Design a protein with these regions (language model features):
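Acidic/histidine-rich catalytic neighborhood of metal-dependent amide-processing enzymes
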Residues: 100-168
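Zn-dependent metallopeptidase/amidohydrolase metal-coordination segment
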Residues: 277, 302, 306, 323-392
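Short, low-order "capping/linker" segments at domain edges
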Residues: 311-325
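Midchain, well-structured core segments that form catalytic/ion-binding scaffolds
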Residues: 139-270, 284-289, 293-302, 307
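Active-site metal-coordination/substrate-binding segment of hydrolases
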Residues: 59-121, 376
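Acidic-glycine-rich active-site phosphate/pyrophosphate-binding loop
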Residues: 68-84, 151, 168-178, 356
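Phosphate-handling active-site elements
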Residues: 84-86, 106-119, 142-146, 206-215, ...
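N-terminal helical capping/dimerization or prosegment-like subdomains
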Residues: 1-71, 241-247, 259-262, 321, ...
Length: 392
């Protein structure tokens, strides 16, 4: 069983999120001697393939079978794999059907592992991610079947294959700040309350501000402005309101309260000056605050924690063993970091599973003509096999 041949077959499935397009049936055929528990919810398919070989720890490989839409401009059919110049082209080649193919290959060949091996897959990662990995882990917890360790086979490498292992991810907080005043004729500014004028002197203290100093494992949490809009695009009418959208990526310890306090403080307010409420939905925290400004305008701040940060300790078993396997196969040590966006690894951490991420390079993910170097896929399967062999 060669990983590149498995990858070719996986690419052929048009598994646009949240559909698996039958890919799970193909995986089931390849792992015929594994027990399968398939779980469908609201159009999302999740599955875990499990094989108990001993009384030792449960090591799980995980990933998502769904892909983003291919878009226009491909040199070939994105769902018909094309091999050229040492690369394999197709949607999902890097993100992340290559990781799944390598894991399948390693799991199918495993014989001497002294515990339980599994592969957990979802078709809901690229989309909303509400009914995917988190729901499956919740189900496994109810059954008392949560894994002890997990490797999420996301494409983590940057410049060369083997250069990066993710041991955590920053959390993501989305914010919408709205200032509301009184619109009117630009010739009579004294009869208006212009929210843009109120925002302008404050904006510099918000844009790009570091909310903390960072740490060895996490870069500083920075306020990144993503959108500003207000008014009706008419030169002689002042706007009634202005809206600022922003995102904050932060490490363990940064919460909605920290973002709220800084934003309010920029307007010379504190928490007691605002009416705030909190709620939670599908494990995601939300906060809504309203306040009156001295200039006569009103302020509304909406914050949502779209993903929680996590960190696996550098001396944990999964990090140490995976690092050793990467060093052995690639001949060089991998950097341990937490950079980049979010992934389903955060859900494993939420359920107390020691987790690390490792996969192929990510230089063409979500792009047209997505491709993966064939040797990277082959070496990834070797790394996963070595990890299984030496995990005990």
């Amino acid at each position: 069983m060669k990983p590149i041949e498995i990858l070719k077959e996986l690419i052929k499935f048009r598994s646009l999120t949240p559909s698996d397009d039958g890919a799970f049936n193909y995986v089931s055929m390849l792992l015929a001697d594994f027990s399968e528990d398939r779980f469908e919810l609201n159009g999302v398919t999740n599955a875990i393939f499990t094989k108990r070989l001993g009384l030792g720890p449960h090591l799980c490989f995980a990933g998502h079978i769904d892909v983003v839409p291919p878009g226009e401009g491909w040199a070939s059919d994105p769902f018909m794999p094309v091999e050229a110049d040492g690369f394999l082209y197709g949607r999902g080649a890097q993100d992340m059907k290559s990781g799944i193919a390598a894991a399948i290959c390693a799991l199918a060949a495993a014989r001497d592992f002294k515990g339980t091996l599994s592969l957990l897959l979802t078709s809901d990662e690229e989309g909303d991610g509400i009914y995917g990995t988190r729901e499956m882990l919740s189900k496994l917890r109810e059954q008392g079947a949560l894994p002890d360790f997990a490797v999420v086979a996301e494409p983590t490498c940057e410049v060369r294959f083997g250069d990066t292992i993710k041991i955590g991810r920053r959390g993501s907080i989305n914010g919408v700040l709205t200032l509301t005043g009184i619109g009117g004729h630009a010739a009579y500014p004294d009869k208006c309350i212009n929210p843009v004028h109120i925002l302008a002197p404050v904006l510099a203290s918000l844009a790009g501000h570091d909310l903390d100093a960072g740490s060895e494992d996490f870069a500083p949490a920075k306020i990144v402005i993503t959108d500003i809009r207000g008014g009706s695009q008419v030169v002689n009418v002042t706007p009634k309101d202005v809206c600022v959208m922003f995102n904050v990526r932060g490490g363990v310890g940064l919460g909605l309260e920290d973002v709220r306090d800084y934003v309010l403080g920029s307007f010379e307010l504190d928490a007691k000056d605002a009416l705030c409420s909190e709620s939670e939905s599908c494990g995601k925290l939300e906060m809504s605050c309203t306040a009156q400004l001295r200039a006569g305008a009103s302020l509304h701040l909406a914050l949502k924690s779209s993903s929680k940060p996590f960190l696996t300790q550098r001396n944990s078993k999964i990090v140490q063993k995976l690092s050793a396997s990467v060093q052995k196969i690639c001949g060089a040590a991998a950097e341990l970091n937490t950079a980049g966006g979010t992934s389903d690894a955060r859900y494993f951490a939420e359920f107390g599973v020691e987790t690390a991420e490792f996969g192929v390079r990510n230089d063409t993910i979500h792009q047209i003509n997505e491709r993966v170097e064939i040797s990277d896929v082959e070496n990834l399967a070797k790394i996963f096999s070595d990890l299984i062999e030496n995990f005990g």
